Amino acid sequence: MKTLELALPPSPPSLVPSFNYNSTARSVGNDVRTNFDVQLFLRKPKHQKSEPVVVIQQPQIQPQNPSSRCSTSDILRLMDSLSLPGNEDIYSCLAKESARENDQRGAHELQVHIMKSSIRPTITFINRLLLMHVSCGRLDITRQMFDRMPHRDFHSWAIVFLGCIEMGDYEDAAFLFVSMLKHSQKGAFKIPSWILGCVLKACAMIRDFELGKQVHALCHKLGFIDEEDSYLSGSLIRFYGEFRCLEDANLVLHQLSNANTVAWAAKVTNDYREGEFQEVIRDFIEMGNHGIKKNVSVFSNVLKACSWVSDGGRSGQQVHANAIKLGFESDCLIRCRLIEMYGKYGKVKDAEKVFKSSKDETSVSCWNAMVASYMQNGIYIEAIKLLYQMKATGIKAHDTLLNEAHLQM
């Protein structure tokens, strides 16, 4: 007789919910396995040979798909069905959840639920609701709530102000700042330097030069210039650069005893915008002499400036060597600028080396830059080959390159 090993069917697994409030999803874990083996041993005659054991393997239990995360609306409905009263702690958690998930519907239902409740919200709690609506992109609701607030603190003003900046409503942001300034003069709060930096950005966007100059004077009055705040200094340099006042921008830079990367990057941007390409290269050299760290923005503007300097690409090669030394050559934007610069000077082989050194084969800008370099130097066959490779890879080429390729074909 042969020996049989029988595996009973698995018992139903117990569902143990695993909630993780720090993650974006909740999962229902299931790692339960059952294995009840029963063996029936029968006497075997001596004249029979032993046969192999037949094993019926137990099928593995597949884990269930993770359950979807409960939304703010679901929790509010559950509270209503159980007649659970709400409080500021619960509502604050739900407001934070709606803000993180950009849940406009949940934010609206939470607002209605709070209005129907009997709680008397504090300023801190209302600020949480303001932040929720701003995060959900509802600046209109935020302004309505803000305008109806009988008392406001600095956070109330800052949330609405930054919401206007984030949404691109720069005129309203400037108007809010003027109102905030009047409110702060009553001793309610002090305006920090980063608010003034944001106001300067708004002034540049709405082309209000006079208001920006008044903000600069306010920076002196409040002592922020003496503190040499890097963000504020960079904002001032960018502001004057937007209005093509390079002398004023450079004066702000030279007044700094320890100008950092932010301030110098703003100066490099201003000089490139005004077509001062030699000055951009001098800025780059000056940063190196003073030991100031360079960032991607600085390298990008300097390489673009090198494309317009008639030196056969020598300046660009030196900047390239510096980029390799500091580890910026692997950046997608820097590689694109290098390909454009080498293509401008007819150094196609150098452009190809930069292009082929990339480990990321899906960089659209680098592929288009390499095609443009080929066409710029009359190497249309290689350009068309590269366009076919882009099509096979699923990379979209610029329409101007495609039109020029069709003309050459």
UniProtKB/Swiss-Prot annotation:
PROSITE patterns in the cross-refs: PPR
Gene3D superfamilies named among the record's database cross-references: Tetratricopeptide repeat domain
Membrane-spanning ranges: none
Keywords of this entry: Repeat
Short name of one Pfam family: PPR
GO terms for biological process, alphabetical: RNA modification
Single Gene Ontology MF annotation: RNA binding
InterPro entries xrefs: Pentatricopeptide_rpt (IPR002885), PPR_At4g14850-like_plant (IPR046960), TPR-like_helical_dom_sf (IPR011990)
Entry annotated with the keyword Repeat: yes
PPR repeat placement: 87-121, 122-152, 153-187, 192-226, 229-259, 260-294, 295-330, 331-361, 363-397
Highest taxon of the lineage: Eukaryota
NCBIfam families the UniProt entry points to: PPR
Family statement drawn from the similarity comment of this UniProt entry: Belongs to the PPR family. PCMP-A subfamily.
Protein name (database record): Pentatricopeptide repeat-containing protein At1g31790
Species this protein is from: Arabidopsis thaliana (Mouse-ear cress)
